[in-house]
Amino acid sequence: MKALDLLIRDYAENYKPSSLKASVLLKHLSNDAEEDKFIIQGIEQIVSNRDNKVAVLVRAGWQGNSIAEMLDQKGIQYFNALFRENDSEYLSFYNVALEEFHNATSGKAVQRDLQRCLRAVEARKGEIYQRDDKKYIFDSMYKLLEILFIESRKVDGTSKDKYEYIDFTLGNKGLKHMMEFIDEQVVLTTIHAAKGLEWEYVIIPKLNGFAFPSSYMCNPCQDAGSCNRGLDYCEFTYAEEMKKAFKEEISILYVAITRAKKDVFLTVNTGLNRWNHMKTTSCLLNLEGLALVDYEWKSIIK
């Protein structure tokens, strides 16, 4: 893990092929269904030990939807944080929670008042989401609000100090930091939301071009002629105009791999996309100095 950390950091700091060497675990699957199935098998293997926690970290929330559906089908408990910070339900939750927090309290955080706040937020859930497929946003945010109120008991100082802690957290939309205290062994979230958090194991799926990196890098990269594309792979060639975009994407990858305490697992598939074209592996997998090592869950997770 240390060598991988240094290699990715070197690419983030120096816009050129690295002289460092590192390896990463990568499973190459045949299609989307096989990739999702493999990820679920890994999750099941990891959580068979109650002391383990695992996060599936995606570049964009939509990339985790099929994994969430399979977890639901399998009856595997997980915390769903695939929502975006600009989702209307996400923003509405904060508006309602902050308003009801102020209504229920008078400058002091007393647990009786905090429970009244929770009931008031629950009563207004119809304002926060209208579509059934967005209910998970309310449920997840509500759970984080409950945890915030519980964790506020540990804040040193008076009830006013606890009030200010809660008010600051809600005012700065900081509930995601409460994910550190959730009970679920499995977390499904974006890399962006995972900043500052850690899990024993991290799975990073969908390491494809136009997924990770996103189209915001891949489209201009093609226009700039900064990639060598094969049938199912892409290699980055460091055109000067792509420097900013590349550094942003490699920095996101760095955040993802450094969320793991024990190990990080990558997956990719080169099946057909929705236009019936073969998907390419990400250029981030084809960096000079990075060795890709195949793996099976049972040989690593004991």
Region locations from a protein language model:
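Helicase P-loop NTPase motor core
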Residues: 1-78
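Conserved short internal alpha-helix adjacent to the catalytic or cofactor-binding core
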Residues: 20-27, 73, 86-116
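Conserved helicase motor
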Residues: 61, 82-88
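A short acidic (Asp/Glu
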Residues: 62-70, 199-200, 276-280
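Conserved helicase C-terminal RecA-like lobe
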Residues: 100-271
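Helicase C-terminal subdomain and adjacent C-terminal extension
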Residues: 234-238, 244, 262, 268-302
